Amino acid sequence: TSYSGIGDRYVTVQLNAIAPRDDKGKPATSRALSEGDRALVIQSLLQACDANDGAADGMIFDVEHCGFDPMMLVCKGAKTDTCLSAEQARAISVGFAGPKDSRGEHVYTGFWYDTGIANTRGLPGLLVGAAPFLPEDRTSMDVDHEAALAATPIAMVGDTASWTSLSAFSSRGGKLLFVHGVSDQWFSAQDTTRYYRQLTADNGGAAAVMKWSRHFLVPGMGHCAGGEQALDHFDLLAALVNWVEKGVAPDSIIATGAAFPGRSRPLCPYPQHAQYKGVGDMQKAENFECR
């Protein structure tokens, strides 16, 4: 979690720099963006990217092709509820792009723009401010120093998080499934996806790796579960058992959730995403396909 912690703190530091101060003189991170500002970001995000998967349904399945840019929301004049100040838009844009060192290289990936970034229930989304377990009141960050601190314990135990040489595992019939909520506010789904792309590159390409490993992204879902606009109920274990014991690879996994009663969607193995077929009830997974 060392590097992911840098990513989380980096977002918080950007918000701290523009946040009003509390009665102790510390940044009131949760007030850097008002409730209206956060709602504006989510509404604009959905307008830009929701329908890319063929269904304007409050969920962004084609997240990699989402072209949302907070700078598009900068006020032309005075700040109102229908726009962001330049400082607010810049803080979001810089924070979500991820921390870079003095050489301009990413220390940790950025975060995708997704509906859960403004969550207020459970673990707060990244736009809300620092989570209770990551207290932070700094307004600047020495990324080089943070990266050096993170590298020390990893060097001592070995960087197992970057290992992609899994031929011994796969050759013995091992199967490996990854699942990650796109709105995870602790570990970036971009980072897991980066690892999976490297895994495929180092093990014969996507077609070869998909014979023993698949990666599923869950729009709107936060850290491990939850999300105010997510379908976070799915049986990954059953999919793994069917693959190992019956030889049935998971071409999709059906997801439901309390956020959208009566709705189901297929979770698709990366790089595919659920796409509406264009006909049929959009509440039903059967009317979507993995593309």
PLM feature segments, named:
Residues T1-R291:
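C-terminal His-loop and adjacent cap/lid subdomain of alpha/beta-hydrolase
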